[in-house]
Every structure is written in structure tokens, then in C-alpha cells.
């Protein structure tokens, strides 16, 4: 399997970057992962990296993005925080990935049976965790207002996990003028996804891609 290079990264579109990840997850679910020489990839990436996507996911030990999407060293950036919440550090990391390092896609990846989401639903208070869970509270309140309060507890948590992922995804473009500009120009795309810890499958939603502006398209074609 070929290691990501600047040339490969430059010619990828956001849509193609998404397709690579979707295909990788299908391989993962089918247990047909690509054969990679990881030591060779260590050597080939020692002088630089050209990842084509950045994935924001939870710290849950079952949700490692490189494994879920069957990617190797140097292929993707991985940002992880409980509840896949967006903060200034995450936004800064995404701005570096896309504006500086040239990544073409942002993925916000929630997952089923999320402990952080469950904690937010139960209004847990525990040290610094309290502030983190407060970032998930808007999703809890929105699901409650939509009639979700009458759902069984497990189903309510899953609804909140999905809504939280949607809200975090929208917050990225709302809070980062840099990323919003790249998106408007068609230089990056953004998608949401939910990973099933039962099946290993990622269900994607709210895929957002813009037609590249003429100048951006010409630059990518060079």
C-alpha cells in the first residue's frame, strides 16, 4: 500500500477523500484490511507527512480512527477527546491539518454506547469532566425538547450521541473562519458519522461538499 505523498494529497478532492475512508471502513467490517509494511511507512514519512483527512473522535478505546478506516501511518490526522466535542484546541488542530498540512476532509465521528454522552445525560459532576460534559448538554436538552425524554434510557443516549455529533460538526464551521473559508472555496469537505461498537460499521450523515472555486480548482490541478 502506497504511503501518502504531497502529490497524492494535492490531487485528492474532498469527495475522493471521503470515499477512501468509506471504502476503508467497508474493508474493516469485512476483515479485509490492506497489507501494509508499517516499518516502511515509518521510513517514508520520516521527512514529512501529507494526511488527506482529520478525524475528530472520542477517546473510547474501541474507536481508533486509523483502525476503523483501515489507514496507515501518515494517512490521517486523529484528534480525540471524550464525547468528540469541539474546543479551541481541536479547532486549532483542524486549522493546522487543513490550512497548513493540506488535508481535504474533516470527519466528526460519534459512536454508540458513548460513556461521555451517558454521563452528560445523567448530569454527572466530576472534576474537570464536568466542564467537558457541559459541552454535550445542548444536545441533551434538544433531544429532551423533541420528545426524547420519554424514550428508554439506552435509546435516549443514542439519540443524544447522534445529535451531539451533528452539533459539534456544525460548530466547526461556525467557530472557525479559516475552516469556513476553506469549505466555501471547496478546498475541504466535512462529514459526520456514527460508529457502531457492535458491528464496526460507520454510518455517515450530513455530508457537505462545495464545488471548488475556479482558482482553487486550478491550483489543485497544477
Enumerate the predicted regions with their spans.
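Conserved functional hotspot residues or short segments at active or partner-binding sites
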Residues: 108
